[in-house]
């Protein structure tokens, strides 16, 4: 008796591009334009964080777009692709889901754009994964830097001390 799920035998799609950005614009010709690729978020606070923030009872909300372009997706029609996120020292939580249909399948590639409202609790690296059938396809991290109210942003060529 074969106890292996046949979906586990399918090769996973290959990642061509995966990044966080401000937005993704699709032109009339179908070409995707990624606006401002980011790998970190700096929050410059106007007042100190409340003490309960460290206990995860208060969070800062931040909107982010995650874009990925996948190849070799033919075997995954009708499946949902999910974006999962993990805060520093925490487990993964589902952030969003997109159903893969043929209409989103131009020339052998699949582009997925997840727009998520993230609840950020404390500074550090937040990990994100795109999954299909609970199998990880790609992982990217986003660093959260929280600047205290008394520290301003550094200008170009300046180092923050």
Report the location of each language-model feature.
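Contiguous segments within soluble domain cores/interaction surfaces
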Residues: 2-132, 136-161
């Amino acid at each position: 008796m074969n106890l292996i799920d046949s979906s586990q035998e399918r090769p996973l799609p290959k990642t061509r591009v995966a990044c966080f950005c401000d937005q993704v614009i699709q032109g009339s010709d179908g070409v995707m334009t990624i606006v401002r690729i980011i790998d970190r978020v700096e929050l410059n606070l106007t007042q100190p964080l409340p003490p309960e923030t460290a206990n995860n009872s208060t969070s800062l909300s931040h909107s982010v777009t995650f874009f990925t372009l996948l190849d070799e997706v033919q075997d995954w029609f009708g499946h949902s692709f999910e974006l999962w996120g993990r805060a520093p020292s925490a487990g993964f939580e589902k952030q969003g889901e997109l159903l893969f249909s043929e209409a989103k399948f131009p020339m052998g590639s699949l582009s997925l754009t997840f727009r998520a409202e993230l609840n950020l609790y404390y500074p550090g690296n937040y990990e994100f994964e795109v999954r299909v059938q609970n199998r990880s396809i790609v992982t990217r991290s986003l660093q959260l830097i929280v600047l205290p109210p008394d520290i301003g942003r550094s200008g170009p060529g300046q180092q923050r001390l």
